Amino acid sequence: MKHFSVKACAKINLGLLITSRRADGYHTLETIFAPIDWFDTLEFTESDAISMECSNLDLLVDDSNLCIRAAKALQEHTGVKRGATIKLLKRVPFGAGLGGGSSDAAATLNALCKLWQIDVPSAELHKLAVKLGADVPYFLEMKGLAYAAGIGEELEDLNLALPWHVVTVFPEVQVPTAWAYKNFHRQFERPVPDLKTLVRRLCHERDISVFGVFENDFASVVFEHYPVVREVRDALAASGAQFVSLSGSGSAVYALYEGRADAVKAAEAMSARFRINMTPAGFRME
């Protein structure tokens, strides 16, 4: 196959607890990743060299782009001499904490293995993914909810999907991840709840009393410094949602709804000012 297209879905974080800062400067964390049906589309065509086009002119398509980096890393690892033209239809906002760039990189690794007809062991692909970014392994390997630890690369498939409708709102501001890590309020010395057990209670028993445990350590500093993000949080909290949270380091905020009608109403209200996505209950990546 010399040409095909793939979807690259975004994610939200159900809880994000920063547990330590390593000697190399990276922070360790615990979180639950959940996919949402907000996706980019990537087209791959075999060619002599690696090149890229993007529908969003604000996104660089040079060697700093994660898709280009993924393609060249795979080339170098396997010795493949072929190239590819990558066309990215960018829908997922960047600087939003939704993992769009990481998802695009994971899609590139998987797609180029298929395009170039190469069989790379999953453990080797995982190592390439980790070098590209902490969220890349999730998009490479998982379909539904997953527990993540380490810098995000230690994954456990929970074999679950969220039983709530998800409305995700992009407040039209970008939060630099490096800034968020530099400024969040550190609380390393504290007990960390068992997120895996709690998310199973949420999904199997609909025990919404445990929602309060799923805190995001970036939330307070992001809401403090970005009033529009706080405004979105407050509007969603007043819309009948069962849970509202920042995703990743922001700026996107999501809300979970038991009923589809409430989710649709909230999505319509927020779409007058912001880019939004609504994901149905039970969603899993293809």
UniProtKB/Swiss-Prot annotation:
Q: Which residues form the active site?
A: K11, D135
Q: Which UniProt keywords apply?
A: ATP-binding, Isoprene biosynthesis, Kinase, Nucleotide-binding, Transferase
Which pathway does this chain act in?
Isoprenoid biosynthesis; isopentenyl diphosphate biosynthesis via DXP pathway; isopentenyl diphosphate from 1-deoxy-D-xylulose 5-phosphate: step 3/6
The entry's ATP-binding residues are P93, F94, G95, A96, G97, L98, G99, G100, G101, S102, S103
Per its record, the protein catalyses: 4-CDP-2-C-methyl-D-erythritol + ATP = 4-CDP-2-C-methyl-D-erythritol 2-phosphate + ADP + H(+)
EC number(s) in its UniProt entry?
2.7.1.148
Biological process (GO), any one: terpenoid biosynthetic process
Protein function: Catalyzes the phosphorylation of the position 2 hydroxy group of 4-diphosphocytidyl-2C-methyl-D-erythritol.
**Protein's recorded name:** 4-diphosphocytidyl-2-C-methyl-D-erythritol kinase
Q: Which gene encodes it?
A: ispE
